[in-house]
Amino acid sequence: MTEAPHVVAEGTVLSFARGHRLQHDRVRDVWIVQAPEKAFVVEGAAPHILRLLDGKRSVGEIIQQLAIEFSAPREVIAKDVLALLSELTEKNVLHT
């Protein structure tokens, strides 16, 4: 039996799981998520979204901030943010 995917809701408050952190690699000028014994590059809007995760603000508050900051429709921002955060929660990079 497979486990149901982790779906992040707008009321969820997320932070990085223990041992995981976002870091800018100045040499390569890329953002990476450092994890125990591995690291992976995050591109596009992902670094900006991940920098807003502070363990205090809800996902909905982050979506609202991004919609205002980028003058973009909230629904578009929400779809992308929820997809990214759900994927990273599924991979145990983020937790509630």
Curated annotation (Swiss-Prot):
Keyword Cytoplasm part of the UniProt annotation: no
UniProt KW Mitochondrion keyword: no
Keyword line: PQQ biosynthesis
Pathway membership: Cofactor biosynthesis; pyrroloquinoline quinone biosynthesis
Organism superkingdom: Bacteria
GO MF annotations in UniProt: quinone binding
GO biological process: pyrroloquinoline quinone biosynthetic process
Subunit structure: Monomer. Interacts with PqqE.
NCBIfam families in the record: PQQ_PqqD (TIGR03859)
Function according to Swiss-Prot or TrEMBL: Functions as a PqqA binding protein and presents PqqA to PqqE, in the pyrroloquinoline quinone (PQQ) biosynthetic pathway.
HAMAP family on file: PQQ_syn_PqqD
Similarity comment text for this entry: Belongs to the PqqD family.
Protein name: PqqA binding protein
